[in-house]
């Protein structure tokens, strides 16, 4: 089904605290400007917060990463009462730092869904939005018959660590990894076996 804006496909709807959170959307290439604006707004708004993800405009998520994710229909966004509240990318690509990890499931690349760039605008934080997004990841992975979901969390991102652990993700390893926005730093690698 098309949204009123005709921009993306509706996937799921749910209610939270009397407000309708709906329209987890698979974004399309024509949505690039809107997607980029969302991430830039997120980066700006997180600058004054207690946790800084290290993301930088134009560096992470980069235009190339966003365009590729849109082209592959791997970028999802959640609308709450008509406003974009959260975004994420789901694919099979990992940082080199994932190799050498003692994963619980021995699976090839295309049997594991990887979560990237999951972010929630500060106005929607603490309202169950991130939890809903992770539930969507689990649902999508199940529909695609994936064997596991994996992700990395920047050391110090306590809210994310608590969220993933509360949803059954298990810490597999802490390792130094390089990303353009953070340089070499510690990341915690997590896995949810499906």
Name the predicted role of every residue range.
Residues 22, 83-87, 113:
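Glycine-rich phosphate/pyrophosphate-binding loop shared by adenosine-nucleotide-utilizing enzymes
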Residues 23-37:
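A short beta-loop-alpha structural element at the N-terminal edge
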Residues 44-64:
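Conserved GNAT-fold acetyl-CoA-binding loop/helix
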Residues 67-77, 93-97, 114:
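A short helix-loop-beta-strand connector motif used in the catalytic cores of GNAT acetyltransferases and
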Residues 74-88:
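Conserved beta-hairpin
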Residues 89-117, 125, 179-181:
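Conserved acyl-donor/pantetheine-binding loop and adjacent beta-alpha core of acyl/acetyltransferases
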Residues 126-139, 166:
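Conserved acetyl-CoA-binding loop-helix of GNAT-fold acetyltransferases
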Residues 147, 154-158, 165-167, 177-194:
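C-terminal "cap" of GNAT-fold acetyltransferases
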